[in-house]
Every structure is written in C-alpha cells, then in structure tokens.
C-alpha cells in the first residue's frame, strides 16, 4: 500500500520465494498476487534449476515496454528457450515445492541439532532455509577447512548457514558431527 500510495512500484526479489511459500503453507497467489506486487523475479536457480529466473509482471504499465527493457538490460540470451523450458516441469510437477520442502526441513533439522550445543545461539527463527548462528570465534578456522563459511557479523561472530534443494540428512549429520568434534577438541585442549 505504501509503495502504491507514493506512486512507486512494488518489486519482490523472489530468489527464495518457493521457500517462503512452503514455510508459510501459503500459495503464490496469496503471497504475491493478493498483496499487490507489481513485479516479481521468480527464482529457480537457488531452488534446483540449472539456471533461470523469470520476471513476472502483474502491472500492465510495466509490461508495456518490458520486451524492450529486457533486451536493453542484456537479459535476452540467444538460447532462452532452453532456460525457459526448465520452468515447465518445475511448475507443473511441483518440483519447486518438493525442493523447497527439502531445504526448509534440512535447515530445521540443523537448527534442532545446533540448539543442543550450549556454545551456539540461533539468532533467527527462520522457517525457511537460512539460519543465522552465533558460534565461538575459535570454531571459524576449523569450519573453514571443511565448509564454505560466511561470517555475516564479524563483531558478534554470526555465521550464515544455508541449506539447498539437494541437502541430505547425511550432509546435516556430517556437519553436526564435525561441530561436535570441534567442540570436543576445544574442551580437551582447555582441560
């Protein structure tokens, strides 16, 4: 409402929109169309597609010149049909939903396991596939040896953990076991 009341368009970056829809047990219609979104970048790449994001316009004014804008913005590749073709099974067979359920469930599984470590603090109550976790700074180096580690807050040492469409229970167990090894080696060292 604020955007439209101030003559602005409302764009939603939907890179993880499937995760949000699944997490809230909602629908794309409820989350996007019914809320007055004008333009959605509908994500596929972060939810299992090889490559591809779709720009979906719900606003006739924006749609008028969109083919021109798309070309001028260098978003029209010569083999676009191969990128676009992925969306057919992705949507019709609800691959988007299956993949989002998996990544959200694996994040929840990690959260449940990490909560058992007294040295760990879960910062966000994420329903999706991203966790922000405060860990001891001494854990950074050993974690970086085995996993890509992204520290989002250097001062508080908060890391970002992201699960994906292909994260397995074995991946989660390996990660949690490794955290346990780090904690154990630190405990043994300080005795």
Model feature map: region roles:
Residues 1-134, 139-140, 152-167, 175-182, ...:
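Conserved PLP-enzyme active-site core in the AAT-like
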Residues 143:
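Conserved nucleotide- and phosphate/pyrophosphate-binding catalytic cores
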């Amino acid at each position: 409402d604020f955007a439209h009341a101030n003559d602005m368009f409302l764009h939603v970056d939907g890179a993880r929109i499937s995760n949000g829809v699944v997490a809230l047990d909602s629908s794309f219609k409820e989350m996007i169309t019914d809320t007055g979104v004008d333009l959605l970048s509908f994500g596929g790449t972060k939810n299992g597609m090889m490559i591809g994001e779709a720009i979906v316009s719900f606003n006739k004014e924006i749609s008028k010149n969109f083919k021109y804008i798309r070309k001028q913005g260098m978003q029209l590749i010569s083999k676009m049909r191969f990128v676009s073709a992925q969306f057919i099974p992705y949507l019709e067979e609800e691959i988007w939903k299956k993949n989002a359920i998996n990544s959200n469930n694996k994040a929840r599984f990690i959260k449940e396991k990490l909560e058992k470590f007294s040295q760990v603090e879960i910062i966000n109550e994420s329903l999706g596939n991203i966790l922000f976790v405060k860990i001891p700074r001494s854990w950074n180096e050993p974690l970086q040896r085995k996993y890509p580690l992204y520290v989002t807050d250097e001062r508080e040492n908060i890391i970002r953990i992201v699960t994906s469409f292909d994260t397995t229970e074995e991946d989660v167990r390996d990660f949690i076991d490794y955290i346990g090894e780090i904690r154990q080696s630190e405990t043994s060292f300080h005795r």
